Amino acid sequence: LILETLMQIDAMLDRMPDNVRQAFLLSQFEGLSYVQVAERLGVSVSSVQKYMTRAIVACYQVAYAE
């Protein structure tokens, strides 16, 4: 079940725009703060917050879809 969910999240990330996917990966897997992610991507912190909201909502939908 966990492996299946991770595979679904991976597929969901593949469908995300590059900036959303990059922000999510930098934050969640590299442990960067939103400020650091914003600097790395050359965008504002509010943009990173929007990207993360989009990615987290999509992950939630994958994890809890019935």
Each model region followed by its residue ranges:
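Acidic, proline/glycine-rich intrinsically disordered inter-domain spacer in sigma factors
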Residues: 1-11
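Short, conserved glycine- and acidic-residue-centered signature motifs
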Residues: 2, 30, 52
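Short helix-coil-helix linker/hinge
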Residues: 13-20
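Helix-turn-helix DNA-binding module
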Residues: 14, 30-47
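A short pre-motif secondary-structure segment
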Residues: 23-24
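DNA-recognition helix of helix-turn-helix
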Residues: 41-65
